[in-house]
């Protein structure tokens, strides 16, 4: 009677469920249990037991369902099989189930054998087997768990909770198939079973037509069917681009297209067609842009024009786009002046009045020199020096130096732009200047005394041949009535017989055959006083004494430090990184196993949550203690729901399992850090017991990286590593050892934030930073564990650092398995022999060096997590430091097999080779492109790999690097290539 009551309540909900259904894409239904109204006659096993067809009436219409509810009879194995279903064109089918499940706690005594799930199976066949039923023919699709269960109060109120689940199966290869439902002790009513496949409808997208296509998947790793489209009239595939492709998903939906069609030159897009450009408009290339109006200084265009011709006197530079106005050369520069400064001339001018309509104005300066005696002239670029290159000036001034005296110079300044080279005429102005003097000498004081001044000077080397003597004029400052003159052929002079402590004005002038050259500026130099001379002697003596004292003090300090350092080296190890004892944590972790009653630890460190605040939505995995669900948690305000992950403790648990389950929650509850998984709370007073944590959308780091192979920048990967290191630094500061640090135990959220999780193997450290915890047994993850932890089962934060180095390698290889296919015994032997994981491909040198530091055999020489965070912060702040890549040998790093047999014989087939490197999804790509034999494959280039359709950078590199080893093997055995 209870089942019929359940059926009646479900019938009330059935109509609402049908009204809410909405199909995606174009669905082709193969089986619809509800529509057949009980006429299908499905097979039950064992016959007459278990599943039963029931009928209820709603709105004078019969409603049919299959139900089973043998919850108190011990172990159950009840099967319900559909009739044989012809699959038509389908390769992948969708199975939609609508059902209800009753809460096991609603039965008297809790029904210890009661379950709340059932199993879904399928079997393929080319013929209908009739009533012949064999379990071994069926393959399990999934365990079906309800999102909502019908509890006692719901059942009494006839408020039955209806669940809807959908699964996809494929690819199918036989003519038809069966579905089967296995009951293992649940109270289930199956109201609807609908099986269908999908088609992508005919579509016009981005100027390309795509035909109606059956929604199929190429393979499990490539669930999209690629469909080629055809361009509409006057549309073309862009040069060097890909033709229009759309991907038909297994859901019957078109994804964003790859490649495109563009309206050709002279045509523009109007809705879903290409139309010729109107007169006066043009389009120069196939693109998405519309036709453009002809620019200034062009002639009117005709319909469908691809360009507009320039008016007479106007031009386009080769690099000018056709959309740019036609332009002309500029006029000459304005207001050119030449200002002489000894052997220099400064040329100044202003921009031309007419720029020709362009902004790329540059100036070119040429020089001509003339000898006054003969009147001969010639170019002078080789003998003069410009302040900047003279033929591509953007400024409106330039200084010309090294000019010869008594010479006439003419300078021409030409204005040019991008079209000046298309005409023969020039636009320039000239300025002339006569140089009558040499450049002024540069004077400096070399030495002085109470009665003398030693003065030196210099002039340009090019002018020294014209100077025959130098004239030095000097006088006392303030005496305008007398002065002294000394002449010399050299570049220095000592002025004697001067008064002590007196300032003199000194000027040097060059004398040439033609007359006086330019004079230097007047310098003020002062002789020493008699007291100053004596003081200098005293100061000199004091300085020597001070120097001697400093030398003696330095020697003493050196000896003292040498002795102290020697004692330090004799008493302690040479630790290269910071000492953790310098920073004591503000908070210390408490081991929940020290509590006699684990409930006390739960009460102290966690928040108890009532199960009514938690909603389980779907199974996302299975943990050590039970199933893991994605669900929601009502906030304390009761209005907002947040997504959470829910770990459940399975029925029939032992006391040890209960203690370990609650201890993990007590451990997590003590941590609060951005890079540690956050505990929301626990359900410990109701069954099933639950641990509720924040929900991490991208799941485990290793699986996430394998799915996103090659999609992240190096900076993003280093950012992930920095987050993990920050979390481990926090744990180390709390005197806490993780013991199982690996990429599989790092969770990633939607913002790529990485958080440390899984504290099942973790243990506490004592107050001493170098204390260890010795385990009493249990499995150790060999590939991630430090050698001292493997050999002596002693774990420290230093052993966590070793594991962190392995995580770094996993991240940089996008989730490759450490040490590949080596056995655990081979891994331990290799590590003890000094082998370390080789450089990942495209790994920055600084990152690999940090890995090697983490893998130091002596644990005291490994960096602390604080050091690692600091190093990664510096690398992130200076991204250029990540551009230097470590040396990489693909045949060592990837260790992809290049032969199929032990005797070094190359792979016999291309598919065998691709399967060995886990790239079998590209087998069809190689076959279609004509690479059907190994001899052809080894001739492929990187461009060939891209051309056949391998688009992911990580997959391109994996195939390319495997080819290197393959070529070596082929050459070794002498196969011609």
UniProtKB/Swiss-Prot annotation:
- Phenotype on deletion? Mice are viable, fertile but exhibit aberrant development of tail vertebra and susceptibility to carcinogenesis.
Tell me a GO biological process for this protein.
notochord formation
> Which stretches make up the Protein kinase domain?
614-876
Record domain Eph LBD: where: 27-205
Per the UniProt entry, the effect of residue 589 to E is: No significant effect on kinase activity and loss of binding to VAV2 and VAV3
Where is the region Mediates interaction with CLDN4? 1-205
The effect of residue 740 to N is: Loss of kinase activity and binding to VAV3
Q: What is its main location?
A: membrane
Which superkingdom, per the lineage?
Eukaryota
Q: Could you tell me which residue ranges the Fibronectin type-III domain spans? A: 329-433, 439-530
Q: Membrane topology for this entry?
A: Single-pass type I membrane protein
What is the active site of this protein? 740 (proton acceptor)
Q: Where in the cell is it found?
A: Cell membrane; Cell projection, Ruffle membrane; Cell projection, Lamellipodium membrane; Cell junction, Focal adhesion
Where, by residue number, does the polypeptide cross the bilayer? Answer: 539-559
Recorded hits in Gene3D superfamilies, A to Z, give:
ephrin a2 ectodomain, Galactose-binding domain-like, Immunoglobulins, Phosphorylase Kinase, domain 1, Single helix bin, Transcription Factor, Ets-1, Transferase(Phosphotransferase) domain 1, Tumor Necrosis Factor Receptor, subunit A, domain 2
Indicate whether Phosphoprotein appears among the record's keywords: yes
Q: What is the effect of changing residue 931 to F?
A: Inhibits EFNA1-induced vascular assembly and RAC1 activation in endothelial cells. Inhibits kinase activity. Loss of binding to VAV3 and PI3-kinase p85 subunit
One GO cellular component this record assigns the protein to is: tight junction
Q: Where is this region: Negatively regulates interaction with ARHGEF16?
A: 887-977
Complexes and interactors: Homodimer. Interacts with INPPL1; regulates activated EPHA2 endocytosis and degradation. Interacts (inactivated form) with PTK2/FAK1 and interacts (EFNA1 ligand-activated form) with PTPN11; regulates integrin-mediated adhesion. Interacts with ARHGEF16, DOCK4 and ELMO2; mediates ligand-independent activation of RAC1 which stimulates cell migration. Interacts with CLDN4; phosphorylates CLDN4 and may regulate tight junctions. Interacts with ACP1. Interacts with CEMIP. Interacts with NCK1; may regulate EPHA2 activity in cell migration and adhesion. Interacts with SLA.
The record's family statement is:
Belongs to the protein kinase superfamily. Tyr protein kinase family. Ephrin receptor subfamily.
What is the protein name given in its UniProt record? Ephrin type-A receptor 2
Gene name?
Epha2
